[in-house]
Amino acid sequence: MYSANPTLGYYVPPLDVNNLTDQQTAISIEHLSLYYQQSRALSDISMRIPKGQVTAFIGPSGCGKSTLLRCINRMNDLVEGTRVEGEVKLHGKNIYHPDVDVPTLRRRVGMVFQRPNPFPKSIYENVVYGLRLQGIKNSRALDDAAEQSLRAAALWDEVKHRLHENAFGLSGGQQQRLVIARAIAIEPEVLLLDEPTSALDPISTLTIEELIHDLKTKYTVVIVTHNMQQAARVSDHTAFIHMGKLIEYADTDSIFTSPLKKQTEDYITGRYG
């Protein structure tokens, strides 16, 4: 798969994810293992995720792809008995270092979950919620941020005349775009999407997929999906995870047309998984 270069206006070959420079890397995962109590969920994973592109994690149910995603903003910390070995570096800084402030990390690495989870507030208050937590009180600044975020999430034209209505009045697809707007309002560097369309209808799914293409012009996007066709459509690079191990990681076109590992080929062609 070739990646659009929004600056130059033409298509360029994808980066070689196995030979990224530090300048090209947003997230560096180094010998990462994760344990729930005594059970190992991830085993010695090392990979680099490039800046400003979409990386997909695929694999069978229970393979560890969502667990790996949640390591990138330490959401697994919320699960009792979790232990992590190895490092996850965001722009060169290990996010598991004791000095790291986790709330600040999660502002830098936003996350959107499988099912839309708007707050029981107005559309407007959902979008500016994180900004208010940061102490921003200026009405003009909040208004501008709300509009910019809703536009970026391809939702502004649908809700601009109903900003103060309850967010629960939106459709499922609209709610998911609202959640994306809420995530990007605080200007994260990375956006994590955990099966963001699995609960949506096909039309809403297409809208979200088109949005993902737009988002990568400003953010590094990492998506977990059980839908291989979706991974092929939206991602520049794909990692195949199986039984907590990284089996293969390359540009998406190579993964889907000429995988190097038999396990990857078997999964892609439906022989197991």
Curated annotation (Swiss-Prot):
Its EC number is 7.3.2.1. Keywords: ATP-binding, Cell inner membrane, Cell membrane, Membrane, Nucleotide-binding, Phosphate transport, Translocase, Transport. It catalyses: phosphate(out) + ATP + H2O = ADP + 2 phosphate(in) + H(+). InterPro entries: AAA+_ATPase, ABC_transporter-like_ATP-bd, ABC_transporter-like_CS, P-loop_NTPase, PstB-like. ATP binds at G59, P60, S61, G62, C63, G64, K65, S66. Disulfide bonds: none annotated. It is found in: Cell inner membrane. Residues 27-268 form the ABC transporter domain. SMART domains: AAA. One of its GO terms (biological process) is phosphate ion transmembrane transport. It is a peripheral membrane protein. GO terms for molecular function: ATP binding; ATP hydrolysis activity; ATPase-coupled phosphate ion transmembrane transporter activity. PROSITE patterns: ABC_TRANSPORTER_1, ABC_TRANSPORTER_2, PSTB. Pfam families: ABC_tran. It is an enzyme of class 7 (translocase). GO terms for cellular component: plasma membrane. Belongs to the ABC transporter superfamily. Phosphate importer (TC 3.A.1.7) family. Part of the ABC transporter complex PstSACB involved in phosphate import. Responsible for energy coupling to the transport system. The complex is composed of two ATP-binding proteins (PstB), two transmembrane proteins (PstC and PstA) and a solute-binding protein (PstS). This is Phosphate import ATP-binding protein PstB 1. The gene is pstB1.
